[in-house]
Amino acid sequence: SVGFKAGVKDYRLTYYTPEYQTKNTDILAAFRVTPQPGVPAEEAGAAVAAESSTGTWTTVWTDGLTSLDRYKGRCYDIEPVPGEDNQFIAYVAYPLDLFEEGSVTNMFTSIVGNVFGFKALRALRLEDLRIPTAYIKTFQGPPHGIQVERDKLNKYGRPLLGCTIKPKLGLSAKNYGRAVYECLRGGLDFTKDDENVNSQPFMRWRDRFVFCAEAIYKAQAETGEIKGHYLNATAGTCEEMIKRAVFARELGVPIVMHDYLTGGFTANTTLAHYCRDNGLLLHIHRAMHAVIDRQKNHGMHFRVLAKALRMSGGDHIHAGTVVGKLEGEREITLGFVDLLRDDFIEKDRSRGIYFTQDWVSMPGVLPVASGGIHVWHMPALTDIFGDDAVLQFGGGTLGHPWGNAPGAVANRVALEACVQARNEGRDLAREGNEVIREACKWSP
C-alpha cells in the first residue's frame, strides 16, 4: 500500500545529530542518563531530546504540517561518565522557539516536564543548563541584586549576618517580635521567618508582621544601622501572597521572603516583579530542593534550580554551607555560588559547570549559608564565600547561654574580627581559630 507504516520508531534516526553545530540562541542541557539494560546510548540520548521537545512515539500525519528541523531538540554529544559503566552525559540543544519568553515555568515544563518517567531510562538527572543571552533578556531577574541591596542597607565590605528565629513553630507574635528585637539589637543585620512559618493558628501573619516591624524600628533607633526581618509572604494563593507583600511594604520594612519551590515559579516571578516595583528586597528559601536534587543519578542538580531562581527573581537564596562537608562538595558548591553572583562564568567541569554562562548584566543573587553553623565556622565561611554572602546562624545565635542579644554580639564580633584579619593579610584557613580566640576577649 502507499503511504507509511505507523509503528514505534527509532529516535536516533531523527534526534541524534552528532554533527550539529549549536547556535548561541539554543538552550543547552546536560543530562546524566542511565538507560535500561540493552538500550544503546545514542537511542537513550535521542529519546531524551525527542520526548522533551517535538517527539512522540510514532509518526503522525500532522508532522507534515511543520518543520521538524526548526523545532526539534537534538542530542548533539554523548560522553561516558568516568567510573560509571552504565551512565553517560547526553548533551541536548533546544531551539529558542520552543520556549515562552519570561517563563521559568514553561522552560521547566518543556525540558523536564515529561521525560523523567520515560520507560527506556532507568534514571535521568539534569546536571546543568546553558541559558542563551537572548532568553535571559526576556526575564527581569532579581528585584534588586547585590549592589543595590548594599546601597539600600548601607553595608559594605563584609558578609551580612542573619538568624532564623527558633523555635520555629509555637511562639506567639509578641514573643516572636521580642526575639527579633534582641538579635537585631545585638548586631545582626537580619532575622528570618522560618520557611514553614506562614500563617498558623498560634501566630497569624498580620500579627507577626506588626510585631516584627516594631522590633526592626526599635533596633534601628538604638543601633543606628538599617535592620531587616525576612517576612515570609508565602501563602496558599498568589493573591494572598501579594496581599502579605503589600502589607509589608505599608509597614515600611526592607525585605520579604518566599519559598520558591513549594510556592512555585509562577508565584515567585509574580512576587519578584512586585518587589522590584515597590522597592522590597526578596529573600528566597529553597524548601523542597532535596526532593529534587538529592539523588545523584535522578532529578535535577541544585545548580539548575539556582539558575532558574536567578531568572525568576530573588535577592538572596540558600545555597548550603560548605563547612564540615567533603572537599569535592566545596568546589561544586562554589561553582553554583559563582553562577548566582557573577556576570560571566566559564565552563569548568571540576566545579560541576558544564557550560559557559553569560548573564548579560542580570543582577546577582546573594548566596545564604545556613544550617548548623556557629562562631567557630566564621573564618572558614569568610574565607570561602568572601564578602558577597549572608551568613545565617540560628541555634548559633539563640543558643548562647546568656541569650539572643549576646549571641548576636558574639557573631558580629567574630565576623568583624575575621574580616579585619583577612584585610590585614592573615590566612583565615590556617589562623582562623586563633583569630576567634583573640576576638573572644571582646565578646560576651
Swiss-Prot record:
N6-carboxylysine carried by residues: 192
Positions of Mg(2+) binding: 192, 194-195
InterPro entries listed in its UniProt record: RuBisCO, RuBisCo_large_chain_AS, RuBisCO_lsu_C, RuBisCO_lsu_C_sf, RuBisCO_lsu_fd_N, RuBisCO_lsu_N_sf, RuBisCO_lsuI
Class in the EC hierarchy, top level: lyase
UniProt keywords, alphabetically: Calvin cycle, Carbon dioxide fixation, Chloroplast, Disulfide bond, Lyase, Magnesium, Metal-binding, Methylation, Monooxygenase, Oxidoreductase, Photorespiration, Photosynthesis, Plastid
Cell compartments where the protein resides: Plastid, Chloroplast
Biological process, per Gene Ontology: photorespiration; reductive pentose-phosphate cycle
Enzyme active site: 166, 285
This protein's GO CC annotations: chloroplast
Enzyme Commission code(s) on record: 4.1.1.39
Molecular function GO labels: magnesium ion binding; monooxygenase activity; ribulose-bisphosphate carboxylase activity
Reported modifications of this chain: The disulfide bond which can form in the large chain dimeric partners within the hexadecamer appears to be associated with oxidative stress and protein turnover.
Gene3D superfamilies assigned to the protein according to its UniProt record, in alphabetical order: Ribulose bisphosphate carboxylase, large subunit, C-terminal domain, RuBisCO large subunit, N-terminal domain
Record PTM N6,N6,N6-trimethyllysine, positions in chain: 5
Annotated positions binding substrate: 114, 164, 168, 286, 318, 370
Site, Transition state stabilizer: residue positions: 325
Reported function: RuBisCO catalyzes two reactions: the carboxylation of D-ribulose 1,5-bisphosphate, the primary event in carbon dioxide fixation, as well as the oxidative fragmentation of the pentose substrate in the photorespiration process. Both reactions occur simultaneously and in competition at the same active site.
Record note on quaternary structure: Heterohexadecamer of 8 large chains and 8 small chains; disulfide-linked. The disulfide link is formed within the large subunit homodimers.
UniProt name for this protein: Ribulose bisphosphate carboxylase large chain
Organism, scientific name: Ephedra sinica
Lineage: Eukaryota, Viridiplantae, Streptophyta, Embryophyta, Tracheophyta
